[in-house]
Amino acid sequence: QKESTLHLVLRLRGGMQIFVKTLTGKTITLEVEPSDTIENVKAKIQDKEGIPPDQQRLIFAGKQLEDGRTLSDYNIQKESTLHLVLRLRGGMQIFVKTLTGKTITLEVEPSDTIENVKAKIQDKEGIPPDQQRLIFAGKQLEDGRTLSDYNIQKESTLHLVLRLRGG
């Protein structure tokens, strides 16, 4: 009796398969749940491939996936293919100073886009990216550009200005 109930619960939750394609062209199949975090997925890749999570960058639909988010947050469904890029050098830290004087520390890569950086700020502070304006060396930073495009290096400080709705 107990067993059949458990079985039913598992069937209802239902896992799904996704594929992870590496730069060498190898495809790894993973069993996941929509509620799995990206961190969980990286742990599964480590189990299969022995690659430490901190060396993994996962890309889906051109976006780099953030550890704290879930597969369903990114609308990753069964049979979706993620791309795995290895992060060889360590990342770097940058600082983001808000108007209230608070300083946020972020782990980034020179190849991260401004959009990625805004997503990281959202994860830490809960501020939606469309309300964020980032300023560096007096310039407003464009979403599609990367940190290296602006010559933003480790320990650089960006300034965060909030864009109020409308206007």
From Swiss-Prot:
Recorded hits in SUPFAM superfamilies, A to Z, give:
Ubiquitin-like
Which residue numbers mark the site Interacts with activating enzyme?
Answer: R69, R87
Position(s) of the covalent cross-link Glycyl lysine isopeptide (Lys-Gly) (interchain with G-Cter in ubiquitin)? Answer: K21, K26, K42, K44, K48, K63, K78
Covalent link Glycyl lysine isopeptide (Gly-Lys) (interchain with K-? in acceptor proteins), residues: G91
* Segments forming domain Ubiquitin-like: 1-15, 16-91, 92-167
Q: Name one Pfam family in it.
A: ubiquitin
Q: Give the UniProt keywords, A-Z.
A: Cytoplasm, Isopeptide bond, Nucleus, Repeat, Ubl conjugation
Q: What is its main location?
A: cytoplasm
Q: What SMART domains does the annotation carry?
A: UBQ (SM00213)
Where does it reside? Cytoplasm; Nucleus
Q: Which GO terms describe its cellular component?
A: cytoplasm; nucleus
Show which residues form the site (Essential for function): H83
By its UniProt entry, which InterPro entries does this protein fall under? Ubiquitin-like_dom, Ubiquitin-like_domsf, Ubiquitin_CS, Ubiquitin_dom, Ubiquitin_ubiquitin-like
- Anything else the record notes? Ubiquitin is synthesized as a polyubiquitin precursor with exact head to tail repeats, the number of repeats differ between species (up to 12 in Xenopus). In some species there is a final amino-acid after the last repeat. Some ubiquitin genes contain a single copy of ubiquitin fused to a ribosomal protein (either eL40 or eS31). For the sake of clarity sequence features are annotated only for the first chain, and are not repeated for each of the following chains.
What does the UniProt function comment say about this protein? Ubiquitin Exists either covalently attached to another protein, or free (unanchored). When covalently bound, it is conjugated to target proteins via an isopeptide bond either as a monomer (monoubiquitin), a polymer linked via different Lys residues of the ubiquitin (polyubiquitin chains) or a linear polymer linked via the initiator Met of the ubiquitin (linear polyubiquitin chains).
Per the record, the similarity remark reads: Belongs to the ubiquitin family.
User: What protein am I looking at?
Assistant: Polyubiquitin
Native organism taxonomy: Eukaryota, Metazoa, Chordata, Craniata, Vertebrata
